[in-house]
UniProtKB/Swiss-Prot annotation:
Its main location: cytoplasm. This is Glutamate--tRNA ligase 2. GO terms for biological process: glutamyl-tRNA aminoacylation. It comes from Gluconobacter oxydans (strain 621H). GO terms for cellular component: cytosol. It is an enzyme of class 6 (ligase). Monomer. GO terms for molecular function: ATP binding; glutamate-tRNA ligase activity; tRNA binding; zinc ion binding. ATP binds at K243. It comes from the Bacteria. InterPro entries: aa-tRNA-synth_I_cd-bd (IPR045462), aa-tRNA-synth_I_codon-bd_sub2 (IPR020751), aa-tRNA-synth_I_CS (IPR001412), aa_tRNA-synth_I_cd-bd_sf (IPR008925), Glu-tRNA-ligase_bac/mito (IPR004527), Glu/Gln-tRNA-synth (IPR000924), Glu/Gln-tRNA-synth_Ib_cat-dom (IPR020058), GluQ/Sye (IPR049940). A motif ('KMSKS' region) lies at residues 240-244. Its EC number is 6.1.1.17.
Length: 444
């Protein structure tokens, strides 16, 4: 068994195509199969090296380790060989219509109440007509003559699927400049590389019928591939996710401070009967079951992803958290603040709260209380009971309790009205910084 993820380097990976990468990887590893990363870079006008580099970086960050790495641009000789074979068999035929002419034909068919598909006019082209067209400087694009009838398969998600080939246009597989299109290159690669299972979005269902026909023309049996088409991923309102691709690019999510396993855990379960939960990669692999994927479109819920990320960070061991922490941070600091971070990008804020400079809010009605707190602050050395002893004394002497006792201290010491436990922060800040902050708060 062998699966592949085949992105085009025409943009950054977003949660939509990352979901397909996760599905292919987990399905492969769950079944002890190989996972191939293939860069479909035949579109030289839009493809960029920096996007290819970003794809590798994003997948590595997610922990999706591939067994093989292939670029389509390195296989052009093989494609040319297959193209000539299909031309010789008559399955690829030359077409000389311009885009303007094709649009005119399409509109005429619509006006006549016919399906706007290609009319195969160029199949009737004689050798003399072709020679005259070429003599006039025209270069053909090449269409694949689809078989009659339908192509059917048993889909791992959609159950029985069928594509009526006579209801769609013969696809262009070779451009006028001689470059190959993805539709053909993908089939050649899948056959040559021993791909057995193809997991992709439901927007490829029609394409699958076409590619089965192409594969058969190249000698494959009808059931050579096993397919699984995942329903589309929509935004939380049911709209197209494409409108938010920039904000949902893996690059952006990484910069925002989301944990990679939070994303993998979420994408592994979204749109399935399994509730999302934070998992290790081994747990995600063991639990993955493609039969649990719903046939209905899934909705991407950032709130749910952030909740998963929060849980992941709250339970992240110090050793695993080190990559997010300042070099000077110790385990005590991490255990103090991890319950108050939703994103790793928030960690520097709490480091500054403890060790940096804060601007305390003005508390004119509490200045006398804060002065009293400063006057009664215990001398060092401090221990685990320092906070309790100090606040108990303040409570007894001031008559304050609850919020009226603790909130002025929190605002003075951290500049925040919520956050980690103050008894831990007090020890991390030390007496000198605590004194300075109380004085600043009194003068604010």
């Amino acid at each position: 068994m062998k699966l592949r993820f085949a992105p085009s380097p025409t943009g950054y990976l977003h949660v939509g195509n990352a979901r397909l990468a996760v599905a292919n990887f987990l399905f492969a590893r769950h079944n002890g199969a190989k996972f191939l990363l293939r860069i479909d870079d035949t579109d030289t006008t839009r493809g960029k090296p920096e996007y290819e580099e970003a794809i590798g970086k994003d997948l590595s960050w997610l922990g999706l380790k591939w067994d093989e790495y292939v670029r389509q641009s390195e296989r052009l000789d093989r494609y040319a060989e297959v193209i000539e074979k299909l031309k010789a068999s008559g399955r690829l035929y030359p077409c000389f219509e311009t885009e303007y002419e094709l649009n005119a034909k399409r509109e005429a068919r619509i006006r006549a109440g016919k399906a706007p598909i290609y009319d195969r006019a160029m199949l009737k082209l004689t050798a003399d007509q072709r020679a005259r067209a070429e003599a006039n400087g025209k270069t053909p694009h090449w269409r694949f003559r689809l078989s009659d009838g339908s192509r059917k398969w048993q889909d791992l998600v959609m159950d029985e699927c069928s594509v009526k080939l006579t209801a769609i246009s013969d696809p262009v597989l070779v451009r006028g400049d001689g470059t190959i299109l993805y539709t053909l290159a993908s089939v050649i690669d899948d056959l040559d590389m021993g791909i057995t299972h193809i997991v992709r979005g439901e927007d490829h269902v029609t394409n699958t019928g076409v590619q089965i026909d192409i594969a058969e023309a190249l000698g494959a049996k009808p059931d050579h591939f096993t397919f699984a088409h995942l329903p589309l991923l929509l935004d939380s309102d049911g709209g197209k996710l494409s409108k938010r691709f920039d904000s949902l690019a893996l690059k952006s999510l990484r910069q925002d401070g989301l944990e990679p396993m939070s994303i993998v855990s979420y994408l592994a379960r979204v749109g399935s009967s399994d509730d999302p939960q934070v998992m290790t990669m081994d747990e995600a692999i063991a639990a993955y079951d493609i039969s649990h994927v719903s046939k209905s479109a899934a909705r991407f819920d950032m709130t749910q992803l952030l909740a998963l990320n929060r849980r992941a960070l709250h339970n992240l061991p110090f050793e695993d958290a080190k990559i997010h922490l300042p070099p000077e941070a110790d385990e005590t600091f991490w255990h103090a603040v991890r319950g108050n971070v939703d994103l790793s990008a928030e960690i520097p804020h709490w480091w500054d709260v403890v060790h940096g400079t804060i601007i305390p809010p003005s508390q004119p009605e509490d200045r006398a209380f804060l002065q009293h707190a400063l006057d009664t602050l215990p001398a060092e050395p401090w221990g685990e009971e320092t906070w309790k002893d100090w606040t108990n004394a303040l409570k007894e002497q001031s008559g304050r309790k609850g919020r009226s006792l603790f909130m002025p201290l929190r605002l003075a010491l951290t500049g925040e009205d919520a956050g980690p436990e103050l008894h831990v922060l007090l020890g991390l800040m030390g007496r000198e910084r605590t004194v300075a902050r109380l004085r600043d708060a009194i003068q604010a």
